[in-house]
Each structure stands twice: as C-alpha cells, then as structure tokens.
Amino acid sequence: AEGLSIRYTLDGSEPTEDSPLYTEPLILTDPSSSSNVWSALENITTSDRNYKIPDTPVDKAAAVSAAAFDGEGNRSGTVTCTYFIDFDEKEDYENAAVLSLVTDPENLFSQEEGIYVRGSLYEEALEAGLIYEGLSWIELMDYTHYYLEGMSSERPAHLELYSVYGDALLNQSCGIRIRGNESRSFPQKSFTLYSRKRYEKESFDPVLFDTGISYDSLILNNSKTLKKVFFFSLVEDREAAVQEYIPCQVFLNGEYWGMYYL
C-alpha cells in the first residue's frame, strides 16, 4: 500500500524500522554451509553427559520475517516463512515431516530473557556463592532460565509443520515454553506449544492425527522419548489408549535441531 515500507530479517528477530528495506525479490540460497550460530552455544546445558558442540555446519533453512511500517510509528503484524532450499536433494529428510520454530533470538538465547540458556539467574547464583563444586548437574539446573515455569516463561514464536509429502499442516503463531524434568538441561530440549488468540488463533488447526479434534496445546518432545514411542508402536493395534505422535525433523530459527516427536 502507498506510504508503507516493508522491512525484513533473516535471523528470526522481529523486523524494525531499522531492518533491511524490501525493494526487490530476495534471492535465497541454501545457507547450510554457513557457520553455526545457535547450535554453537555452550550455555544451554548444565548436564555432564558429554555434550559436544557440532564441529561442522548443520543443515539450515532460510527463515524470513517481514512487517510493514507507515513511518509514523505504526506497523503490521509480522509474517514469517521458512524456506527449505534444495532439501529435496537431501536424503536425511525423505519420508520425514519437517517442523520449523522461529522466534526472536532474545526469547531463547539472551542472558536476560532467553528460556533456552542458563542465563542471568545462573550468573547471579555464581556470584552469590550458591553454585559450588560438588553440586550435580540436576541441582545446578535449579538456577537456570530453562527451569522456569508458568506464563512468565512463555515466549511468542511462529510454527510451521510440513508433512512427509511437503504439504503444509500447520502455519501459525503460538507461544512456546521449555518442558520436562531433567531433560530441561539437555542441549536438545522439549517444548510445549500453546495456541492462543493473542498470538493468532485459539487452537491449532484440526488436521493432525486424523482425529478432527482442535488442540489448544501440543507437546514437542525431544529424542529422549524414543523409548516411549517404541512402546506405543507395540500396542497401537490393540484396544489400548496410546499417545498419537508425528516424528519430525525440527529447525530452530533456521538451524537443524534434531529429531523430535510432536
């Protein structure tokens, strides 16, 4: 529209009036060979389970977020889309659903607000002498941001889910929280996803699991739940209640984050 300018970002951050101006179609290429950013962080765990930071570039998608500005302090909502460039040539994604979560990096990885990191709470505990040699990694977790619960630990994000055939199953904004017990300290953490009117919709679209049911929350479990998923598969043909799940390859702010179960 006349008088509006479109600004965009490629790192998950919210577009501002200082973000790059969209003036012509973007030329996007597969960013997988670029250096790791989020998966290179060390402050996402207190676990002593031999966490190894990836020493080669992980697969990456292009996450584009855009918003319109009128120059008078008003802006539209943010539109986000994740592009998986040349992934049809990557065997690891054959016969697998793909899920993308995009959120402002501050929401996950900043020292003050990030829910995926040890954060400022951990640093304050260090300074106060609450952290000392002999504490287990589970005890250390008490002083981290990823151990926070409740609404204060919820952050806005954009969710996209594509089926094994590439069909879009979900594409909407939602809230995310870290979930679990000791797995909160794992580098690959589980999430709870919340659909709320203030983000976009009151419920997730009822296309999942062939139930016709709309869900206001979904669980995105890390690969630690593989054993549970295996047990479910053993009894799914019997008259027993089992948890429905969708195995999916997850990308967090464009970086590959591993296999999860939705």
What kind of feature is each model-predicted range?
Residues 101, 126-262:
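Conserved ATP-binding subdomain of kinase catalytic cores across diverse folds
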